[in-house]
Amino acid sequence: MFDDQDLGFFANFLGIFIFIMVIAYHFVVAEPKFE
């Protein structure tokens, strides 16, 4: 199974991935407003 180090790495990766997805989504949604 997972140990604490693997779980921490997975949590960090998931958090960073979600953060990047939110930023990308914000750019895609907000971009037309600048034109």
Curated annotation (Swiss-Prot):
SUPFAM superfamilies: Oligosaccharyltransferase subunit ost4p. It comes from the Eukaryota. Residues 30-35 are cytoplasmic. Its main location: endoplasmic reticulum. It is found in: Endoplasmic reticulum membrane. InterPro entries: Oligosaccaryltransferase (IPR018943), OST4_plant (IPR044165), Ost4p_sf (IPR036330). It is a single-pass type III membrane protein. The keyword Membrane applies. Component of the oligosaccharyltransferase (OST) complex. Subunit of the oligosaccharyl transferase (OST) complex that catalyzes the initial transfer of a defined glycan (Glc(3)Man(9)GlcNAc(2) in eukaryotes) from the lipid carrier dolichol-pyrophosphate to an asparagine residue within an Asn-X-Ser/Thr consensus motif in nascent polypeptide chains, the first step in protein N-glycosylation. N-glycosylation occurs cotranslationally and the complex associates with the Sec61 complex at the channel-forming translocon complex that mediates protein translocation across the endoplasmic reticulum (ER). All subunits are required for a maximal enzyme activity. This is Dolichyl-diphosphooligosaccharide--protein glycosyltransferase subunit 4B. It comes from Arabidopsis thaliana (Mouse-ear cress).
